[in-house]
UniProtKB/Swiss-Prot annotation:
Chief localization: nucleus
Additional remarks: Multiple copies of the gene are present in highly virulent fusarium oxysporum strains.
Record protein name field: Zn(2)-C6 fungal-type transcription factor FTF1a
Any GO BP annotation: DNA-templated transcription
């Protein structure tokens, strides 16, 4: 008989082997099966479990069949014993089976056969009755979950023979089956099925343990195992590459020493904590602090920064000019800006990257923005002022830089410094201050204040050694931040941020070493040498000789910063000693400025030979700028001593020596500016303009000196400085304010002279204008009205003052006379409507085309009652007239004679006076003189002797007009003069070349207005005992006209030299003076 085998790993019955052998000798069992055998043995009926059945073997040797025809009652009627239905149907007489053989087979097997298997006999089961129910032991409590009663022979379970891991006898069951554990009864532990499951006819399943239960240990053993578990967790957290390294390190077994006990001298297997962990601790301490995670280059913020840096290479490309303009403006930048304000960028590297197209667009935009003001290229030039040309490019660069303040890098830092300089030129005080502060913070974030040999921003633990050029670029960027901090913080209310002792880097090397990549050691700011070279390094050993213009310029500005801190930021009041004492801080600063100039190497001393050498190296402008700064320090220190003349206990010798040094330094600054003009080197640094302004304030005092030599030198040098300031205000807008301040100081001195007051005391009373004060003057830029039209100040409430006191609407008497009168709004339309008609009338009278800058119609239309108070402005000059109760001579003359606005040439016969023998050669006054305010009733001209010497006694009134109502003023087309034209042949004796001016510059009076007045008398005198100039005087003094003061503001709106057209006037003027003396 063959049956279907259903194999299940959970019910593999190894114990059935004995049962199969029991019936192996019975041949009848292998006969033809009954018809219902397949149906009875269908394995699908056994839902819970099934066993493999292969038929009965021969059972002749084990069982004797007495009656083959006897058929036992089928046991299939008992549903609880369906497992033996196959045997009942085959007609096997179970009652004749020998029990001894059966017991013997049970003893031979490792586990008793399953009662549901074919080898089991339900009738011989002691726990069941003839119906298959548990009758004998029904009251034993096993049906209720109690423990069954076992014989003593079966008391020893099979698992007791197993040994523990320690080799001892096992006393407890290692693992109970799931059913016994659920019923909370003792499990016999047999496999594959325990006795309880066999009796209950349920599957016996042993739960497979995923991990072995930890043995019970004491508390100290658990504490010892904790470091090992922590070490295993740490190993899982590190990368595989680090695991390979860590696997080679043996893990120490540490035995902690009990405190208070003496360690044994005998060797043990366990080491001490110091011996075991000391190498690992040292390696951990010296390891890099940056995380090393495989597959991750850094944190998310670092990834964002890298993405932004990648975008920086392309952002702003659409705003770039053409490649030709980029290269042109780059050359302009290195010619006019590099080295004078900041030593930024390496020209060979920049130009090479620019041609290859590998520069970030934001850097190119920044360079183009700051250099556009100095170019004359028609593709860049615009109709607006020069200092606003690059604003469009600067706006794009500014937007890119301000969005990346979180991720500092050298490119953005360089752009911030250059943009701060550009915003300085456009009078954006708030922007320049903010950009400078952001640049300083970014420089410290990049550790530029340290002289590092490796790039501190190295990622993934890689360190890149910096080349000499890169290290020098980093140093120069940090020094540029230092200079910007000194420039921006030179005001009264703006302290400096960077301390000198925080910068631990050497000073820049010479420019040729930097350009040609020649490493050389230099000194630090305090004179120390950080890295002295060895003889085998191949470097130049003399550190002082390796320093060029840039190094000593930084030292000069650093010293100026200390002087500013002492004089303007409260340190002067904290000095326990007065200025003239040797122990005072003032004397220390005075010694510093003298010693700094004396410490210059021979190659940097001022001489004509050194200037020629620097011209060959293209550093002549930097060389002159450095010497201007050195002289400015001397001037600044000694000017403070001049203002202390009224302090108690001051010595006269101290003040006189300080005055002498201040005048000498002011003269030296003017000489350097004149030398730069003559040698063709334009010193374009904004701070050089401030040095010229400081020198000008001293020259104004020199004009009133009783020493004739000092007076003449001051007049000539004052003209040089004013010319230079007029030129600088084209490129840097804040010099408009400085020129106005100079005009105000000049007017105060002139008023004091006329009033008979002490001029020196009055000139030194006001607080000195600081370089950083322009931030308060122009916090948010310069409007067109401030350099083209008079500014009208209208009181209005702002939202920021909403919680403050309400401002009064009325004016006091003092404010009425001192503050300007606002322009009437209702007259604006009248002014605009009448201006074109008057221009047409002027053209008809002149008979020649007139330039818009030559008309004064905007001033003629202002109401007569507001003329004496409102600040007037010369038409087309672009300058604002300031001062209390101002008086404009142009407006006064236009009111007195309506025909003064004509542009008829002063040399036409119709314009000549009948008293021709009393007239001099027509005077060509600079336009700034016409716009000057000399006080009420004064127009800057000198009246005849019959006038009284009183204040306001030199006014020009209408009664002095000439016969026939001839014009006392008439315009002149200065375009024709600048081009060398000679109107009516009267200017043939004058030089027509544009280079006839003081320093050979082109004439800049094209937008000015001429002034011609045939005098009523040839008898003139110099006011206030001023000597007439000599004929062999410098040509620059002959620009001023008949009054030595009138040459102060010569030069036209463009700031260039005025053609020397006053030679005949000076001769006639001297003649008139001699005639008056003989009269």
């Amino acid at each position: 008989m063959s049956g279907r085998a259903v194999l299940s790993p959970q019910h593999a019955q190894a114990s059935f082997d004995s049962g199969l052998q029991l019936y192996g000798d019975v041949p009848e069992l292998n006969a033809v099966p009954p018809p219902s055998h397949s149906a009875l043995m269908d394995f699908t009926r056994f839902d819970d479990f099934a066993f493999a059945y292969y038929g009965l073997p021969d059972q002749s040797s084990l069982v004797s069949l007495v009656d083959h025809t006897h058929t036992f009652q089928s046991l299939t009627t008992f549903p609880q014993h369906q497992a033996i239905s196959g045997l009942a149907h085959s007609g096997l007489p179970f009652g004749t089976l020998p029990t001894d053989n059966y017991n013997q087979s049970m003893e031979d097997s490792k586990a008793p056969p399953d009662r549901t298997s074919p080898a089991s006999n339900a009738l011989e089961d002691p726990t069941t009755d003839e119906f298959g129910l548990a009758s004998p032991n029904r009251a034993g409590g096993t049906d209720l979950g109690g423990k069954p009663k076992e014989d003593k022979a079966d008391a020893t379970p099979a698992w007791s023979e197993l040994k523990t891991k320690a080799g001892k006898e096992r006393k407890r069951l290692p693992l109970a089956c799931i059913a016994c554990r659920r019923k909370k009864i003792r499990c016999s532990g047999e496999k594959p099925a325990c006795k309880q499951c066999l009796h209950s006819c349920i599957p016996c399943v042993y739960k497979v343990a995923t991990r072995k239960a930890a043995p019970r240990t004491n508390c100290m053993a658990m504490l010892d195992k904790r470091p090992k578990r922590m070490e295993e967790r740490a190993i899982k957290a590190i990368s595989k590459s680090d695991q390979e390294v860590a696997s080679s390190v043996t893990h120490p077994v540490v035995k902690q020493a009990i405190p208070g006990t003496v360690t044994s001298s005998r060797p043990t297997k366990k080491r001490g904590a110091e011996e075991a962990f000391e190498p690992d601790l040292e390696a951990w301490a010296k390891a890099s602090s940056e995380p090393k995670i495989e597959g991750d280059d850094g944190s998310s913020s670092l990834q964002v920064q890298e993405g932004e840096e990648n975008k920086l290479q392309h952002e702003g490309t659409e705003a770039l000019p053409s490649r030709e303009i980029q290269e042109h403006l780059a050359e302009v930048f290195f010619e006019n800006i590099y080295g004078q304000s900041y030593h930024l960028l390496h020209k060979p590297s920049y130009m090479r990257k620019l041609k290859n197209g590998t520069l970030p667009p934001v850097l190119v935009l920044t360079v183009c923005a700051v250099a556009a003001r100095f170019t004359s290229n028609p593709l860049v030039s615009s109709s607006g002022p020069e200092f606003l040309r690059g604003e469009e490019w600067a706006s794009h660069a500014r937007d890119i830089c301000t969005r990346r303040y979180e991720w500092p890098n050298l490119t953005i830092l360089t752009c911030l410094l250059i943009l701060g300089l550009h915003e300085f030129g456009t009078c954006q005080g708030g922007r320049s201050w903010a950009l400078g502060g952001q640049a300083i913070r970014m420089a410290f974030a990049l550790q530029l204040h340290k002289d590092l040999e490796y790039d501190p921003s190295g990622r993934n633990g890689t360190t890149t050694q910096l080349s000499f050029i890169d290290r020098e670029i980093r140093r120069r960027i940090m020094w540029a931040c230092f200079l910007m901090d000194r420039f921006n913080s030179s005001g009264t209310d703006r302290p400096m941020f960077i301390r000198e002792d925080t910068i631990q880097i050497p000073l820049p090397v010479k420019e040729k070493y930097f350009q040609f990549d020649m490493p050389a050691p230099t000194e630090m700011l305090d004179g120390r040498v950080p890295h002295p070279p060895s003889p085998n390094d191949g470097q130049i050993a003399n550190s002082r000789e390796n320093m060029g213009v840039a190094a000593f310029l930084i030292r000069a500005i650093a010293l100026w910063g200390r002087i500013i801190t002492y004089l303007s930021q409260g340190c002067k009041d904290l000095d326990p000693n007065p200025l003239w004492e040797d122990e005072s801080h003032y004397m220390k600063h005075l010694d510093d400025v003298v010693n700094l100039e004396a410490s210059l190497p021979l190659s940097l001393k001022h001489s004509a030979e050194n200037l020629e050498v620097h011209k060959t190296e293209n550093t002549a402008s930097q060389f002159l700028f450095m010497h201007i700064c050195l002289q400015h320090n001397i001037l600044f220190v000694n000017r403070a001593a001049m203002s202390a003349r009224k302090q108690h206990g001051v010595h006269d010798d101290f003040v006189s020596e300080a005055s002498k040094r201040a005048f000498n330094a002011a003269n030296r600054i003017s000489e350097l500016l004149r030398e730069a003009e003559q040698s063709g080197c334009f010193v374009s640094a904004p701070f050089a303009g401030y040095c010229a302004f400081s020198s000008t304030t001293v020259h104004i005092l020199g004009i009133i000196s009783r020493n004739p030599f000092t007076k003449l030198a001051a007049q000539a040098n004052l003209t040089t400085n004013i010319k230079y300031l007029h030129r600088m205000k084209k490129y840097w807008g804040m010099f408009h304010w400085m020129v106005e301040n100079v005009r105000t100081q000049y007017r105060n001195v002139l008023d004091a002279m006329r009033a008979g007051a002490n001029v020196e005391e009055r000139a030194t009373q006001p607080s000195f204008l600081q370089y950083g004060d322009w931030f308060n003057r122009y916090p948010r830029g310069l409007s067109d009205a401030e350099f083209m039209d008079p500014a009208t100040h209208k009181r209005k409430d702002s939202g920021a003052d909403g919680v403050l006191e309400a401002k009064r609407e009325l004016r006091s008497v003092e404010e009425y006379f001192t503050l300007p009168t606002p322009r009437r709004v209702e007259n604006k339309d009248t002014i605009r409507a009448t201006a074109p008609k008057r221009k047409q009338s002027a053209k008809k009278q002149a008979g020649m085309p007139a330039q818009p800058g030559q008309h004064l119609d905007s001033l003629q239309s202002i109401d007569a009652d507001a003329v004496s108070q409102e600040r007037k402005f010369s038409g087309g000059l672009g300058l604002q007239i300031t001062g209390a109760a101002g008086f404009n001579p142009l407006a006064a003359s236009n009111q007195q004679s309506p025909d003064f606005s004509t542009t008829i040439s002063p040399t036409r016969p119709a314009n000549m006076t009948p008293f021709a023998h009393h007239a001099h050669t027509p005077t060509f006054f600079p336009p700034e003189l016409l716009a000057m305010n000399f006080g009420q009733g004064s127009n800057g001209n000198i009246d005849p002797l019959d006038r009284q010497l009183i204040y306001g006694g030199y006014s020009m009134d209408a009664s002095t007009g000439l016969g026939g109502g001839q014009d006392m003023m008439s315009g002149l087309g200065w375009d024709t003069v600048a081009l060398g034209a000679q109107p009516d042949g009267r200017l043939q004796s004058r030089p027509s070349n544009a280079k006839a001016g003081m320093h050979g510059q082109s004439a800049g009076m094209a937008d000015g207005a001429g002034l011609s007045r045939p005098e009523a008398s040839s008898a003139w005198f110099m006011p206030f005992n001023m000597e007439p100039p000599d004929m062999d005087q410098d040509a620059g003094f002959n620009m001023g006209g008949i009054d030595p003061f009138t040459g102060v503001f010569g030069g036209g709106g463009s700031g260039l030299a005025t053609p020397n057209a006053l030679g005949g006037l000076i001769l006639g003027h001297c003649r008139g003076s001699s005639t008056h003396s003989t009269r």
